[in-house]
Amino acid sequence: MNPEYDYLFKLLLIGDSGVGKSCLLLRFADDTYTESYISTIGVDFKIRTIELDGKTIKLQIWDTAGQERFRTITSSYYRGAHGIIVVYDVTDQESFNNVKQWLHEIDRYACENVNKLLVGNKSDLTAKRVVSTDAAKEFAESLGIEFLETSAKNAANVEKAFMMMAAQIKKRMANAPVAPKAGVKLTPGQQVPSNGGSKCC
């Protein structure tokens, strides 16, 4: 076990271009915000270590490009992700409509039991809002995933979103059956789980 942390969780931020994924990451990792918008090219990542239930958790957070032309690059980053945060812009109906497509990408590329969180960003732009909180909440509930609205600009719920995701993953890890180690007796007919395939986390 690495003495610096108890857990290392890989998180992924996905969603349409311009919804504020990079801003959310900057706010959480560095507590900074910039109005100037530069599209992420391919992927970028930052690391932040948090404390949760007396455990030290290192979060490796990957920020992916939302543009279609980067899909083939970013799809490989789904593998091995413990948690995926799907971000849309509350002032952009199309970005919310496209959440279904992003969830399809998760089903296609990510681990079967990966944790998911739906985040509606830019909640500070109340006058420009087009996606209601209730509609998004209802949609998330129908899929059985958690939902939060955030504002990277004023830091509303940003910390909460990442902490919620970390707590979900930690809970899943704690409840997951431990693979048999060498010397452990297996019941007749029981197979040792392999580490191969896409069911990786």
Swiss-Prot record:
**Lipid moiety-binding region for S-geranylgeranyl cysteine?**
200-201
Q: What GO MF terms are annotated?
A: GTP binding; GTPase activity
Question: Is Repeat a UniProt keyword of this protein?
Answer: no
Describe its membrane topology.
Answer: Peripheral membrane protein; Lipid-anchor
Binding of GTP occurs at 15-23, 33-40, 63-67, 121-124, 151-153
- Main localization is endoplasmic reticulum
- List the subcellular locations: Endoplasmic reticulum membrane; Golgi apparatus membrane; Cytoplasm; Preautophagosomal structure membrane
Q: Which family does it belong to?
A: Belongs to the small GTPase superfamily. Rab family.
* Name listed for the protein in its UniProt record: Ras-like GTP-binding protein YPT1
Instruction: Specify the species.
Output: Phytophthora infestans
Q: Which gene encodes it?
A: YPT1
